[in-house]
Amino acid sequence: IAPATANVCAKLAHGLADDMLTTTLLACQCPRIIAPAMNTRMYENPITQDNLRLLEHYGFTIIEPASGLLACGDSGKGKFPDEGLILEYILRAIAYPKDLAGKKILVTAGPTQEAVDPVRYLTNHSTGKMGYALARMAMLRGADVTLVTGETSLTPPPFVNTVHIKSAHDLFEAVTSRSEEQDIIIKAAAVADYRPAVVSDEKVKKSDGDLSLALERTEDTLSYLGAHKRPGQLLCGFAMETEHMVEHAKE
């Protein structure tokens, strides 16, 4: 039901069926999703909140309203949620088999940033789209998903525990501290193999001569996970290649 008024929520919470909508909802046994939208003070009213909690108790899924300018001219929580978010709720409820229910899946995505100084860093062209798509599909199929992501322009999928990282070291710590409890780990991030050996505390000034940076290896997260993989755990790694892709993939 989108939008669901305070009146409709109250009727449904107490089993009233005096029109087609409430009568249908009282009789149906399919997944039921409600998107409350109303004035902020109506939404925050303890009676409305009690009704929403009661609906959740009876198996309704409640989509939290957004915050912003309301139809009445006020500004606050109670705004109709983004249609894309509502669609994700619907897809999650009815569109995909829940063959991954009960599974914990960790996905990495996006690039890493290796600082040169407070202003500059080394990175790559990864968009994160592959990892985000994998995390979203795992979520839609019922998995408990953790997404460890570098800086991207993408919005993390809903219902996913998102962990933001910057460097390869950050990613190593974020992944290895969570790896033991995961059933599946998918490494789709584009992780730097090297980082500056020394990070300047101040911006490196330009000069007439060339600039050389000493680089050192970063932690190999995938190798660590492979060496510490527990029985039954599935580990999947991605590698970006520009030539001999099949041969390198087999390696």
Residue ranges and their predicted role:
Residues 3-9, 38-40, 68, 110-114, ...:
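Short glycine-rich anion-binding loops that position phosphate/pyrophosphate groups of nucleotides
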Residues 12-39, 54, 63, 208-224:
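Short, acidic/small-residue loops that bind anionic groups at enzyme active sites
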Residues 151, 159-223, 227:
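A glycine- and small/hydrophobic-rich beta-loop-beta segment
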Residues 49, 53-54, 99-167:
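Glycine-rich phosphate/diphosphate-binding loop of Rossmann-like nucleotide-binding domains
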Residues 87-103:
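Flexible nucleotide-interacting loop at or near the entrance of a catalytic core
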Residues 20, 29-67, 75-90, 231-250:
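Short, glycine-/small-residue-rich phosphate/pyrophosphate-handling segment
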Residues 28-29, 139-145, 159, 220-233:
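A structural motif corresponding to the C-terminal end of an alpha-helix
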Residues 6-17, 42-45, 116-123, 194-206, ...:
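Glycine/threonine-rich flexible loop motifs
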